[in-house]
Amino acid sequence: MKRILIIMAVLMMLCPDIYALTKKAEDSPAVQVLTSNKNARKLEGGMLKLARPALKKTPMAVVMDDIDMMVMYSISQKADEEEKQFAQQAINVLESYNKVSEIDDPDYRMSIYIDNPVGENFSEIILYTSRPDPSIMVFIGDFTIASLKKVGEISDQKRMERRRAKR
């Protein structure tokens, strides 16, 4: 009985620390991947967080809300030469801001471009997997419209070309 009481006392003493650690983890940068089968997958560097409902129809969505976060990408092995060059232009702009890291994971074979910057501190990144299955990464970061404008213009042209090709 004495041993049980000692163990309980030690656990009670540790509880505040455990709570503090949990709270700290909750405050860390949030990263979540929602796959087509609705399974959440944790990426390195953050706690899981629910993506916004507007992305329900997409096979995958990644949300990151840390101001100093990295954009993760991988250019598809299946992408044609034009798509690879296009993705590389977007990556070059992001790399100039030290905001990009490559994902070394076969599940993330996709090209990347920036679409629809909508505010000073918000932009959407569209990740295209092998057609016809697009995936969307949304991030909130400290990019400005000016830093994304060039790639945004390229993405607008590309989107129009894709629409014309579908007709």
Task: Briefly describe each language-model feature range.
Residues 15-22:
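Sec/Tat signal peptide C-region and signal peptidase I cleavage site
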Residues 88-117, 163-166:
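Short Gly/Thr-rich strand-loop-strand
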Residues 27, 141-167:
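C-terminal partner/receptor-binding element of secreted or periplasmic proteins
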Residues 23-84:
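Early exported N-terminus immediately downstream of N-terminal targeting peptides
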Residues 113-148:
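A short, solvent-exposed beta-edge/loop patch
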